[in-house]
């Protein structure tokens, strides 16, 4: 679930981002969060910032924003520690500042993990300039949740009436994942627990095609060939969005059921739509009852062992 603390609202207003990525920023506060969780029967939620990221081009301002958002996130979690956790926001592409912020959030604020956008000013996940941060997260076995954002390059006068989440987000997620595969991110940093949004976007559709090209193409001037199937199997996936009808079945051909999680995408997806999406997953014939239990509860408890203690504290 996403959250919009006051400092983030202020940032959007200061930057004139009244309709970021084609959608107006939704209303959110702690009371709304608890009401939404009750209506959706969610007992524990990880809060994260959605797109856009906090990088403004001003290094000091970006570091300050990330710190204020994270401290406000920790404060919000402290009001309901048995029901809420949060993912750290990092001031990328400032790598050293992001390492410092990740350490502070994970060690002092007790964040459950970090949230990373697919790109930061054109620096995509998988870029070797991020290696020092990846090494830090790998050493901690950090839960790291990917989130799409505006592509680094937008084609003018094309699909202008279509909000970015409808199409470009899926392209962004797929592009970032393939860049990570091509640059060995999953192999070099195997302990990072990556969560890919929206059932992997276009990955299941393109996996066979990319795999066939990988057999012919060498990457990074070496004999190494990317193994997209292995990398897909390594990652975890949330079921946010309209994923049941086609994506679920396709993803399960490549990914073990233990790597799937429920995700709501509130408040950017309204409660009515979230209820419908959750019901579709609950009623689907594509999953057994045991698989549904894993999707909604069991897999999260396995990935976050401390979660069981918090819920029953």
Locations of regions flagged by a protein language model:
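Mid-to-C-terminal alpha-helical segments outside catalytic/metal-binding sites
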Residues: 2-44, 71-79, 100-104, 112, ...
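Acidic-and-aromatic substrate-binding clefts and catalytic sites of carbohydrate-active enzymes
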Residues: 23-28, 54-55, 92-98, 121-128, ...
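H/E-rich (His + Asp/Glu) clusters that bind or coordinate divalent metals
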Residues: 162-181, 193, 197-313
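Active-site gating loops and adjacent loop-to-helix segments of metal-dependent hydrolytic enzymes
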Residues: 2-28, 58, 152-173, 210-234
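Short, glycine/charged-enriched secondary-structure capping and boundary segments
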Residues: 11-13, 60-62, 101-102, 128-130, ...
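Active-site gating/metal-coordination segments in enzymes
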Residues: 49-179, 183
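Hydrophobic faces of well-ordered beta-strands that scaffold small-molecule active sites
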Residues: 1, 45-47, 85-89, 114-116, ...
